[in-house]
Design a protein with these regions (language model features):
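Glycine-rich, often proline-containing surface loops adjacent to acidic residues and nearby aromatics
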Residues: 1-5, 66-71
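A short acidic/basic microdomain associated with nuclease active sites
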Residues: 8, 28-50
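Alpha-helical scaffolding within the catalytic cores
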Residues: 51-56, 90
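Active-site beta-strand-loop-beta-strand hairpin of nuclease catalytic cores
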Residues: 54-68
Length: 145
């Protein structure tokens, strides 16, 4: 039992560390954001999600667009990566179909080496996928909008 709990604790820590790193990047580049924002704050998003309401890791609002952002990190492979990719592949078109909103996925980690095909499939459905190296291009996009 303890082993399983330790594994989950490690997974949660890597996700929290990545969120902290992304927040630091946003702070250092002058990006204003909110953390842990419910989809219920945006009636049009709540409508398209229906019962599948979500809490986004970050939300960035500009004059032109509101970016709803999910962040994660995978240090190992497994079914979780495939499930998250599938889930976000379903979620992104719903959000992106609402005028003024865009779904953004920031993900990284060597775990993706074993799930490259799922990540490639996700790229086809989610225009805004970034990692910790390419996040600067997202920041540039935000600053221009």
């Amino acid at each position: 039992m303890e082993t399983g709990l330790d594994t989950n604790a490690r997974k949660n820590r890597s996700g929290e560390i990545t969120e902290t790193l992304v927040a630091r990047i946003f702070n250092n580049t002058g990006i204003h954001y909110r953390e842990q924002v419910s989809s219920k704050e945006f009636p049009a998003i709540a409508d398209v999600l229906g019962v599948d309401q979500k809490v986004f890791d970050f939300v960035i609002s500009t004059d032109a667009k509101t970016y709803l952002i999910e962040v994660n990190f995978y240090s190992g492979g497994g079914s979780k990566l495939n499930e998250v990719a599938r889930s976000y592949t379903d979620l992104a078109p719903k959000i992106n179909g609402v005028k003024g909103f865009e779904f953004v996925w920031i993900t990284d980690g060597i775990g993706w080496n074993s799930a490259r095909n799922k990540l490639q499939e996700a790229f086809a459905a989610i225009p805004s996928i970034f990692n910790l190296t390419t996040i600067i291009s997202f920041i540039d996009q935000v600053k221009k909008s």
